[in-house]
């Protein structure tokens, strides 16, 4: 009987070990679906062999991440990761995995992510190029099929970026301006194709400029569940069952970050994009917009690696009348991260200013756990003169779990709050900004 007991104990312990390992992997898959990469520098790859060349080996051996824990659970020595880095082919890497995900706008979702990373040159001086395909199906009957890429030519002379998406995306819209309430919600159903492509030339150290083409096509737009004789803000603005915006853009970028997944103190990011939509290119109307995205990262003390991060995201209509679906809106930045504390599309208007700040601090000395506290303020208006009326605050705190110590990639779990009881969980792989 004692032998049977010991055998059952070993089997139970073994089963528990693999159960914990599976949970850790699912945690990774859960978060990985949140990664979005369309600008230069933000890698979609988190494999140690691709991103470890500039890190101090002795320091990394003292650090711990979820991959180390997983290897220990299956009785593997985490040190094999360092040996792998020495021997593996750094020029081509492919990874793919199914993964559940979650956001306020989609609810529970499921996707299959496939990523391909490669170097176009053998000299190891050229940045890594990447391609990501990640179709998503959600519990709210949404379908998103994004194809995103960032290709660097030899010696980083040019960077070719793309953000191509197909969306079948029922969601709520709340009207225009910053004073709308949850009671104003109207469900929209629509299909969308987005084709954004940019070609940037390196003009100096960390400085790029170039041109792009941006195309947004919405069709099958329908307002659902609207009571008879009710006039929505969409109706007042000018409801159409379809819209096309097609234009050229000028893009200027300064990016001193060496790691855009988890930017280091002292780094700066500034991006300005001017978009001119033209009827001659198939747009429904001539209109233009200006996007100003600026970020700065500060270390407040030489005795600490804690970081104060500040993000200013300004999305302005310069001229003309954009289609309702192309107006600036909460959570419709490239990474769907503005306005934590509010659901995507919660506010919408011709002009949007969003200011965010976040304090990032360590909890465990081995780097496994960290935390953040954050606050943001949005403002929306139909005219530039009323941009500060009203100011819409958001705030919250979050946990950082080190998934990959080589790339400094964190699993980011934030809980945000806003006005009138707005709140929710916000999940990312890599820092929010």
Where are these regions (language model features)?
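Bacterial Sec-dependent N-terminal signal peptides
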Residues: 1-39, 298
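Gram-negative/organellar outer-membrane beta-barrel architecture
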Residues: 36, 86-96, 100-244, 249, ...
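Transmembrane beta-strand segments of outer-membrane beta-barrel domains in Gram-negative
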Residues: 36-77, 81-82, 163-165, 171-302, ...
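Short loop/turn motifs that connect adjacent beta-strands in outer-membrane beta-barrel proteins
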Residues: 80-92, 120-128, 154-159, 205-206, ...
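Hydrophobic core residues within well-ordered beta-strands of beta-rich domains
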Residues: 94, 110, 207, 248, ...
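Solvent-exposed, glycine/polar-rich loop segments of beta-barrel outer-membrane systems
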Residues: 229-236, 291, 324-338, 385-397
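C-terminal outer-membrane beta-barrel translocator/porin domains of Gram-negative envelope proteins
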Residues: 258-364, 369
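C-terminal hydrophobic structural anchor segments
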Residues: 360-394
